[in-house]
UniProtKB/Swiss-Prot annotation:
One of its GO terms (biological process) is ATP synthesis coupled electron transport. The chain crosses the membrane at residues 1-21, 29-49, 61-81. Belongs to the complex I subunit 4L family. This is NADH-ubiquinone oxidoreductase chain 4L. It is found in: Mitochondrion inner membrane. GO terms for cellular component: mitochondrial inner membrane; respiratory chain complex I. It is a multi-pass membrane protein. Keywords: Electron transport, Membrane, Mitochondrion, Mitochondrion inner membrane, NAD, Respiratory chain, Translocase, Transmembrane, Transmembrane helix, Transport, Ubiquinone.
Amino acid sequence: MSMMYFNIFMAFTVSLVGLLMYRSHLMSSLLCLEGMMLSLFVMMSVTILNNHFTLASMAPIILLVFAACEAALGLSLLVMVSNTYGTDYVQNLNLLQC
């Protein structure tokens, strides 16, 4: 495994550990999810470029679109929770059940 792949994998791992450790605030969880998606995007782009696999050249863009949709939904949920309860704690999300 080259050093570049190792660094990208470590970025994903650090974001995953951050997501598992700092779960109290919704904003920190969203930032860790965005870090994971960004590292997946970079890993996918580098792999496709190194292997000259032109058939999958659209896959990183699709992943980026899904990451943008996830960020928009997460931020709208953050605004709704903070307006309703005054805080952005993840434990308030259990109160949103129907």
